[in-house]
Structures are given as C-alpha cells and as structure tokens.
From Swiss-Prot:
It holds the Pfam family DUF543. This is MICOS complex subunit mic10. It comes from Neurospora crassa (strain ATCC 24698 / 74-OR23-1A / CBS 708.71 / DSM 1257 / FGSC 987). Residues 57-93 are mitochondrial intermembrane. The keyword Transport does not apply. Keywords: Membrane, Mitochondrion, Mitochondrion inner membrane, Transmembrane, Transmembrane helix. Component of the mitochondrial contact site and cristae organizing system (MICOS) complex. GO terms for cellular component: MICOS complex; mitochondrial crista junction; mitochondrion. It is found in: Mitochondrion inner membrane. Belongs to the MICOS complex subunit Mic10 family. Component of the MICOS complex, a large protein complex of the mitochondrial inner membrane that plays crucial roles in the maintenance of crista junctions, inner membrane architecture, and formation of contact sites to the outer membrane. The lineage of its organism: Eukaryota, Fungi, Dikarya, Ascomycota, Pezizomycotina. The chain crosses the membrane at residues 34-56. PANTHER family: MICOS COMPLEX SUBUNIT MIC10 (PTHR21304:SF0). InterPro entries: Mic10.
Amino acid sequence: MSDSTSSPVAAAPSTAMTRPVSEALLNEKWDRCLSNLLIKSTLGLGFGVVFSVLIFKRRAWPAFVGVGFGAGRAYEECNTSLKQAAREIRAQA
C-alpha cells in the first residue's frame, strides 16, 4: 500500500475571478444604501411611534411620516454616494 502523505500534492490554480473595481464599488455602495434605508426607516418609525403615543393621541400618521423622512434621507444619501462614485470612476478612466 502506498502512503498518501509521501506523494506531493499539486496546488490547484486559483480559479476565483476577481471583480472589476467598478462592480465591487457599486456592490459596496448598494449594500450601504440598503442598510441605510433599513436603519433610517426604522429609526423614523420609532420616533413616529413615540411622538404618536406621547403627543398625537395614538394616531398612525406620525409613524408613517417618520418612515417617510427616514426613507427620504436614506435615498438622498444613496443618490449622493452613487453620483460621487460615478465621478470617481470617470476621473480614473
């Protein structure tokens, strides 16, 4: 019987494809945009619920307004971030 530890093991060539810089940057920006949307909308909902309970006699509209403000803020930050990334990519090319 042959001992499998004595035979040299050939290293497999790396087949992992590296993504282009622009695609990796875009993926990073989209991840940040989606996480911002989730966080800011949730914070807006939380503030809306608190104001609804404390000030507005448990009405629903402050919660919806809070979600809208959070989502709007996240959208603007995402838009700015993506435009800045596009400018940087164009400057490099």
